[in-house]
Amino acid sequence: IPQPRGTPIRAIADGTVIGIFENDGNRKGIEIALRHTPEQTGLPFWTYSQYTHLSEMPALAIGDAVRMGAEIGKTGNSGKMGRNIRRDALHFAVLFSAAPSWSNDGRVFVPADGFFMDPIAFYRQEGPYVSAELAELPSSEKAVPVAYLKTDGTPVPAGAKRIWPYPCK
């Protein structure tokens, strides 16, 4: 998600910090990962959000609780891409699992029995959530309204539990 360097990145839901990685010398660059309970997201499983290419190490620690919309890092361009040059951007990923357990070996976090989730599925109000099933939906069912915070911190719609990682006007 392209954004100017230093743009604050927001937690997409209430959660807990489970990983902060410098990732010196790899493609992801500076990274933070959060775990979200089913109660925090309103989804029927545990979700894990991953944010990479941050411009600096986050001012958070593993185990910190974060609120939806809290700043968790700043947009940057950290990470190695060989000879390719890219602009400042957030690489944003969501994983999910029926299990609450995960591991962190100091280089990567891994949800137990976890799977990558199409971010579109994360913002759906009901299933399907599995990417292959989502792909089978007719085009008319693939458009998903995404909740967000206004620049003043007001969630749209009110009561949203999952938001876009950047505020909107």
Regions found by a protein language model. Give the residues of each.
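Terminal peptide-recognition signature
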Residues: 1, 15, 69, 92, ...
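Short alpha-helix capping/helix-loop boundary micro-motifs
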Residues: 2-4, 51, 56-60
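Short, well-structured beta-strand-loop connectors
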Residues: 8-19, 59-75
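Zn2+-dependent peptidoglycan hydrolase active-site motif and core
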Residues: 11-56, 85-91
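Residue-level recognition of beta-strand microenvironments
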Residues: 20-21, 54, 75-78, 97
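Glycine- and acidic-residue-rich phosphate-binding/metal-coordinating active-site segment common to enzymes
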Residues: 37-40, 48-52, 62-73, 88, ...
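Acidic, glycine-rich catalytic/binding loops that coordinate metals and/or anionic ligands
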Residues: 64, 85-169
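Active-site loop architecture of trypsin-fold serine endopeptidases
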Residues: 75-89
